[in-house]
Amino acid sequence: MAAMGSKDGGGGGGGMAAQAGRLGVVASVAFNLAALAFYLRRRYFGGDDAAAVRKKAEAEVAPSSGKPPVTKDSIINLDHGDPTMYEAFWRGGAGERATIVIPGWQTMSYFSDVGSLCWFLEPGLEREVRRLHRLVGNAVADGYHVLVGTGSTQLFQAALYALSPPGPSAPMNVVSPAPYYSSYPAVTDFLKSGLYRWAGDAKMFDGDTYVELVCSPSNPDGGIREAVLKSGDGVAVHDLAYYWPQYTPITSAAAHDIMLFTVSKCTGHAGTRLGWALVKDRAVAQKMSKFIELNTIGVSKDSQLRAAKILKAITDGYDRAPAAGDDDDDSSRLFHFARRKMVSRWAKLRAAVAASGIFTLPDELPGHCTFANETVSAYPPFAWLRCGKEGVDDLEGYLRERKIISRGGGKFGADGRVVRISMLDTDEAFAIFVDRLAAMN
């Protein structure tokens, strides 16, 4: 034992040095690991600086539109009908009632209802679509097949496919009275289909076989339209995207053979990318459903569930009558909220046009609205703005030079002295737009 102790005592200095060396290595490794962990945390999860950057980015980009906030010097883009005006409504109590949580296991199958003609249509969405039309009274839904599409654009394409004869000797002519919706020509001819082709202004068409697209109220000018052509070999598709009480008087329940609607212009949820069709003929509905099946193997069930929840919140909002003496409370009544917005915006736009003196707008179109049970004017979601100033033959370019982006009349089959302006952007963007317009002379 003494020998062992003598041995340990004799080598104590070397042992301590070795132990210290090992501790130094361990400490160095630990420090490097800590430094690496800190770097990785900053790199992938963000530190204080990264958090500050994220907060700054969140402050600079609007949460729902992805567009930066506008300033007095901003370019105001009113080319698209981006319905961000509705965000204020959905930030309130109605938005909470429209919130939906989709569990990870839900909506995994392709199929919604295998026994249905439109097997990818969620039953809940069909139910809420029918409820909404009964509430508003803008279309007959009973006795019609309900189809769902990725926006009404896909349903428009499905209708063209369904209405074109198989193996035609020449493509079916597709027409619409000018000014027509600017996407009709582009979408019709995009795939260069042998089944159908764009044939222009319905008022100039001289033929017997055709599909006439009837957009009413009209995009771009808000006018009420009926089919122009009456040939027995022709058929009309009615695009009723804007036939809602915030935009126009609901004078009767439409009952056409094919009627197209879209969530975006009804509720403001353009990003949900959903539309629906009411189709009277079963064979046509089957062909339209087949087109969507082959085109996209159905329609997002997640979007359908969300849309169903949104439509339910709208209809339920009218089941809850405002408290006594609170008739101006529109927090649950979407159409009343949007109507007030449109009335206010059109009044400001007409005042700006009058102040400028170089622009004109279509006359107001009043009518008895069965939904509101009173006579009201139309307040379309787009303004058809014409310029009478000498030398301004390209109004789109004239406005662009003044940092206002619009859509020129040529895209609608009209002349260059007129443009389409969206009335549905944010309050801030709209306010800057009317201020600039009023200053032009």
Swiss-Prot record:
Its keywords, alphabetically, are:
Aminotransferase, Auxin biosynthesis, Pyridoxal phosphate, Transferase
- Tell me which EC number(s) this protein carries: 2.6.1.27
**Superkingdom classification of source:** Eukaryota
Q: Which cofactor does it need?
A: pyridoxal 5'-phosphate
Give, as one word, the top-level EC class.
transferase
Tissue specificity, per the record, is:
Highly expressed in anthers. Expressed at low levels in ovaries.
Q: Which SUPFAM superfamilies has this protein been placed in?
A: PLP-dependent transferases
Q: Which GO terms describe its molecular function?
A: carbon-sulfur lyase activity; L-tryptophan:2-oxoglutarate aminotransferase activity; transaminase activity
Binding-site residues, pyridoxal 5'-phosphate: Y110, S152, T153, N219, D239, L240, A241, Y242, T262, V263, S264, K265, R273
UniProt KW RNA-binding keyword? no
Which pathway is recorded for this entry?
A: Plant hormone metabolism; auxin biosynthesis
Its function, per the record, reads:
Probable tryptophan aminotransferase that may be involved in the regulation of auxin production in developing rice grains.
List the protein's name.
Answer: Tryptophan aminotransferase-related protein 1
Recorded source organism is Oryza sativa subsp. japonica
